[in-house]
Design a protein with these regions (language model features):
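N-terminal capping segments
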Residues: 4-82, 171
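Surface-exposed loop/turn and secondary-structure junction residues enriched for glycine/proline
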Residues: 56, 60-62, 68, 72, ...
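...with weaker cross-activation on analogous glycine-rich loops/strands in unrelated enzymes
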Residues: 1, 36-39, 80-150
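Aromatic- and glycine-rich peptidoglycan recognition patches
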Residues: 2-33, 123-172
Length: 172
């Protein structure tokens, strides 16, 4: 009704939820709580396939989509538009962008929720995969990852696992 009165096609702000979610950031708390907004967005996607994420990024056909998923989650929180997290579709580009910002830590770092975790499965220096840190408990980093068996899944790894290449540590 309001849109019609104003002679508009629609009324409202499509970015309302991402704008609001930005204010639910819990900061960098040493307890491992970190930033909860991006984690909550990621958890709502558990079990989903990749079409939403790679098509959102602009790809016309299926690609390896773990980085697209991570960027999509950041976008839902308004973190790409605000510059908190860089948009990337390649894991190696994500690492480079966090390094350029001086927001990258190696695999020995103890992360917090909302940090971006990068993997080197072959332990050969190639960054193969990326996910979002959900939490850290008792020496274990818990993650939400896209394109894990072609689904969004949760995983756990020991802190310092040799397959963890490092972490992007956004300034929320």
């Amino acid at each position: 009704k309001m849109a019609k009165e104003k002679k508009l096609k629609s009324y409202g702000d499509r970015q309302y939820v991402p704008h609001v979610l930005r204010y639910y950031s819990f900061g960098r708390i040493p307890s491992g709580i970190g930033n909860g907004a991006i984690v909550q967005v990621a958890l709502t996607q558990e079990g989903n396939g990749g079409t939403t994420y790679w098509s959102w990024y602009g790809f016309q056909k299926r690609v390896s989509w773990c980085a697209c998923f991570t960027s999509w989650c950041a976008d839902q929180c308004g973190y790409i538009e605000s510059g908190v997290i860089p948009k990337f579709s390649l894991c190696s580009d994500g690492v480079k962008q966090f390094q350029k910002r001086k927001q990258f830590k190696d695999g020995s770092y103890v992360p917090a929720a909302g940090d971006i975790i990068f993997f080197d499965w072959g332990e050969n220096g190639t960054i193969d995969h990326v996910g979002i840190v959900e939490s850290v408990t008792k020496g274990t980093v818990n993650t939400v990852e896209g394109n894990s068996g072609d689904r969004v899944k949760r995983h756990s790894y020991p802190i310092g696992d040799n397959r963890i290449y490092g972490y992007g540590v956004p300034k929320y």
